[in-house]
Structure formats: structure tokens, C-alpha cells
């Protein structure tokens, strides 16, 4: 790798405030905010709206949509009512 052209790769804390969940990983992302982690060190923190701790796919709280019912409702609403003159 060429020196001086790549962003710094360092430890960063990602925090999902909605799920009260945070994890420490390595990233090139930057932040002005910091947090003291459980190991006593201070790391940049990036707040996210959704993570594996709050996403319905990963939490098992999925909501299935009745797409067949919606399609049938659409067909009934816009079905042709016989031959149109014109």
C-alpha cells in the first residue's frame, strides 16, 4: 500500500441507541464523539439507527405482509367490467 493515501484504520465503537447496544470493531469511519469502553480506553463512537440488535430480521420479530390479499384487492378494484366502447 502506498503511504499517506489510505484513511486510518482504528478501533471504533458503533452504538445502537434504540436497542441500548454497542460493539467495538475496527473501521476507517471517524467521529468527534468519544466513549469510554469497558476496557478503560476511549474510542470514537458512531451512533446508528439500526443494527443487528434492533433489526427485525435478526431479532426474530418480523412482520409478514399479506401480499396475496393486496394483489387480489388491486385486481378487484381495477378489474374491467366488460368490453369498453370507444
UniProtKB/Swiss-Prot annotation:
GO terms for molecular function: structural constituent of ribosome. Pfam families: Ribosomal_L31 (PF01197). GO terms for biological process: translation. GO terms for cellular component: ribonucleoprotein complex; ribosome. It comes from the Bacteria. Keywords: Ribonucleoprotein, Ribosomal protein. SUPFAM superfamilies: L28p-like (SSF143800). InterPro entries: Ribosomal_bL28/bL31-like_sf, Ribosomal_bL31, Ribosomal_bL31_B, Ribosomal_bL31_sf. Part of the 50S ribosomal subunit. Belongs to the bacterial ribosomal protein bL31 family. Type B subfamily. This is Large ribosomal subunit protein bL31B. It comes from Salinispora tropica (strain ATCC BAA-916 / DSM 44818 / JCM 13857 / NBRC 105044 / CNB-440). The gene is rpmE2.
Amino acid at each position: 500500500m502506498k503511504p499517506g493515501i489510505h484513511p486510518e484504520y482504528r478501533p471504533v465503537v458503533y452504538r445502537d441507541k434504540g436497542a441500548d447496544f454497542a460493539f467495538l470493531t475496527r473501521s476507517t469511519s471517524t467521529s468527534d464523539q468519544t466513549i469510554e469502553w469497558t476496557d478503560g480506553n476511549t474510542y470514537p463512537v458512531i451512533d446508528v439507527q439500526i443494527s443487528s440488535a434492533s433489526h427485525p430480521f435478526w431479532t426474530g420479530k418480523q412482520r409478514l405482509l399479506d401480499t396475496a390479499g393486496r394483489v387480489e384487492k388491486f385486481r378487484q378494484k381495477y378489474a374491467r367490467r366488460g368490453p369498453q366502447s370507444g
